[in-house]
Each structure stands twice: as C-alpha cells, then as structure tokens.
Amino acid sequence: MITIEQLISQIEQRQPVLNKAELNAEQRRLSLKGIGNLMMANRQQLSFLANPHYLSSLANTHAGAVLITAEHHNEAPNDTVALIVASPYLAYASVSQLFARQPSVSGIHPTAVIADSAVIGNQVTIGAFCVIGEQVQIGDRSALQAHVVVEDNTAIGTDCVIKPQVVIGHDCIIGNHVRLHAGVSIGSEGFGFAPTRNPSVTGWERIAQLGRVLIGNHVRIGSQTCIDRGAIDDTVIGNHVIIDNLVQVAHNVRIGDGTAIAAHTGIAGSTSIGKRCIIGGAVGITGHIDITDDVTLSGMTMVTKSITTAGSYSSGTAAMPTTNWRRAAVRFRQLGRD
C-alpha cells in the first residue's frame, strides 16, 4: 500500500504538488494499492485527469485520490483527495513506479556461469543460466534476469535492469539506470561488407567491426531492438534516450540525449541524430546524414538527406480508398515527368 504522503514525495521529484499544504493528516495517511481509470477506479486506487476528453467521468469517479490540474480540481468529488499538479500525466508517470511489481528473486543463481575475472558489485542479481565473460564489470544493485549473456570486457553500470535473453557483446559500456528489455542485442556485428568484382560468384568481403557500443545513463531499450557495434568508431546512445521495440540502429550511429524512437524504425550506418528528437514508428533514415536537435519525424517518414532546421517533418500519404489512391498515384507519376 502507498500513502498519499509517499505519492507527494515521488511526484515532487519532478514537479510540485500545489495544494499539499491544504491536505490534512488523515488525507496524507490514506493508503492506495493501485491505479485505475476514472470510470473503473475504486476507493483504494489512484486515478488522474490528463485529457479534458475524460472530464465527464471525473464527477462520478470512485477513486480514492486523483491527479488533476488547478483548472478542474473543483469538479472532483468531495470524498476524493485531489492532488493538484501542473502536469497530471507526468505525475501519473512518476507514481506508477511505486505500484510496479518488484522482482522477488535476488542473489546469484547457481546455474549462472561467471568468469573468475568478472567484478560483481553489491546487491547484484544474476538469474538462471546467465553467462558473464572475462573482465566484465557489473555495478551495484543491477539485475540480470535469466539467460542474459555479457561478453568479455563489457561494463554495466549501477541500478540497471536487464531482462531475459539480452545479449551484450564484448567491450561495450552500459551506463547507470539502464533498462534493456527481452531479446535486446547490443554490440552485435554491424552490416559491413565490401563488394568483390562479381559478388554473385566471389561473394562479399566481410569488414571486421572494431568499434564498440556506448550507452549513456537512464536509457530504455525495448524488446528485440538491435544496436550494432561501430565499424571503426563507436555507436553511441546518449543519456535519457528511449527506444521502442524492434528498432534497428546500425554501426556508427550517434543518438543525442533525450531522443525518443518508436517501433520498427531503421537507422542506417554513420547517421547522427540530435538531442530531443521524436521519431515516429516505421521511420526509415538513410546512412551518413545528420539530423539536428529538436526534430520530429512522423510515422513512416523516409529521410534521405540531412535535416538542418528543427521542426516537424513527414513524407508519404495517409490511407485513403484504393480507387482514390490509384488516381493520386497516376498524378504523382505525371508530376515526375513534368
């Protein structure tokens, strides 16, 4: 159970609770055991109003407490504790961590294979059938769940969570407070090949990938995402970067601090992406280009050259009836001949 007092403390790591001085001792001691939407929440749950579209549900909510802006706080029921904040959605994000289920397993599982030269910090959890290579360093309070592989000479920071089936290649550096979800591949071989005179006969000459992957602090990487090691220089993921599931980051890519990347995006080699960029789902970005800070790319955008001015960019056409699309496609081909 989480008290209102604990919620306030958590919220105020990001923003103030504007009416906390008005809450009495009984309200501050109120205990909650979960989070629900305005319509379904019960007296032991917290809810929030982040979108005015749901304002009609506020007056009838049975939530024990609600996160709300000053503009709407008078519309909450009298028996519901209103916590007034500038951003209810951010407050919800902050307190959600208090209600998350914590893993019950700790310590090192007897089936884990750990090299004698590995340096394991304090309060580290290593799950079943993990393999930890030579000269690996794992920071305090980090948790590796089952079947994680960490190759030689890799360093993992403090307070990291690494989910099952993650593979981290040799010589990589993972920062502090990093979350790698199931099936992530860090530091696999980049897609580097030189063509021979006739690849159909003599094939392609493999280029050894000699760089590393460097991941900053407070990074989250979703399931089945692949981040390849650099060919010569390193592949670099900055601080506070969040990457969704099924994203491909090729060798020598650099991603700036605070950038968010949605699922199915592919970033080709040696491209540099700035800080605070927002990249929608299924975006394709060609190699050897630069994207400046504060760029937003809407879903399925295809980027073929550098972007030097901050702003929002899109490409492609939205869904329409097939007959209309065929007419539009004809006109598009005609424009190309003009």
UniProtKB/Swiss-Prot annotation:
- What keywords were assigned to this record? Acyltransferase, Lipid A biosynthesis, Lipid biosynthesis, Lipid metabolism, Repeat, Transferase
- Which residues are the active-site ones? 251 (proton acceptor)
GO CC annotations on file: membrane
- Quote the function comment for this protein: Catalyzes the N-acylation of UDP-3-O-acylglucosamine using 3-hydroxyacyl-ACP as the acyl donor. Is involved in the biosynthesis of lipid A, a phosphorylated glycolipid that anchors the lipopolysaccharide to the outer membrane of the cell.
**Oligomeric form and interacting partners:** Homotrimer.
| Pathway assigned in UniProt | Bacterial outer membrane biogenesis; LPS lipid A biosynthesis
Instruction: Give the matching NCBIfam families.
Output: lipid_A_lpxD, PRK00892.1
Family listed: Belongs to the transferase hexapeptide repeat family. LpxD subfamily.
The biological process GO terms on file are: lipid A biosynthetic process
| E.C. numbers | 2.3.1.191
GO MF entries: N-acyltransferase activity
- S-S bonds: none
Q: Which reaction does it catalyse?
A: a UDP-3-O-[(3R)-3-hydroxyacyl]-alpha-D-glucosamine + a (3R)-hydroxyacyl-[ACP] = a UDP-2-N,3-O-bis[(3R)-3-hydroxyacyl]-alpha-D-glucosamine + holo-[ACP] + H(+)
Q: Which gene encodes it?
A: lpxD
Q: What is this protein called?
A: UDP-3-O-acylglucosamine N-acyltransferase
